Regions:
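Short acidic linear motifs
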Residues: 1-176
């Protein structure tokens, strides 16, 4: 609502807080915490993306730094699998692990889960990277009154380096 009423600064803060809440919800919990937390974080980040055009240079820089820290706090899929395994062991004992093995017809019942969580983790990290690039591009636009040609144009003044895509490892390009 803030964004539609012309208060993009407040909308960006609220959207960042929603993303922060989502990331905090993923910390140390089992699979359901990770799924709900990443969905909430994704929602906040998508809203933040819509608010970038109305931000100042200072606000863009501040959000870039906050996003760097927030992305680093996100639990890895391995940590989530460890928490899920511990939760099953605590609630169902060894029997729970055997049931998971039986249901999945495998000796590695958590492997499919780890693969799905890795995809979700990479997707969310890609959004974090896109946002940092968009914020750097907005700073570039405001300071130089030009559109950046590529991500390389933003390095080193606006980004530390060209950020790789979390899934492919190839350098990210300017989001459209």
């Amino acid at each position: 609502i803030e964004r539609f009423e012309g208060h993009t600064n407040e909308a960006a803060v609220i959207a960042f807080d929603a993303a922060k809440l989502g990331v905090r919800a993923t910390e140390g919990g089992p699979m359901i915490d990770f799924l709900v937390g990443t969905a909430a974080a994704q929602n906040g980040l998508d809203t933040l993306k819509l608010s970038i055009a109305g931000l100042t240079v200072h606000q863009c820089r501040e959000l870039q730094l906050k996003l760097d820290g927030l992305a680093a706090e996100l639990d890895t899929p391995e940590e989530v699998v460890r928490a899920e395994r511990a939760w099953i062991q605590y609630n169902f004992g060894v029997k729970g692990t055997f049931v998971a093995m039986w249901e999945n017809e495998t000796l590695r019942p958590y492997e499919e889960f780890r693969t799905r969580m890795r995809k979700r983790y990479n997707d969310l990290n890609r959004v974090f990277i896109e946002l940092r690039i968009l914020l750097a591009a907005q700073r570039f636009r405001l300071e130089k009154s030009l559109e950046p040609d590529s991500v390389e144009t933003l390095v080193p003044d606006y980004l530390r380096s060209v950020l790789p895509d979390p899934e492919t490892g190839k350098p990210m390009t300017l989001p459209k």
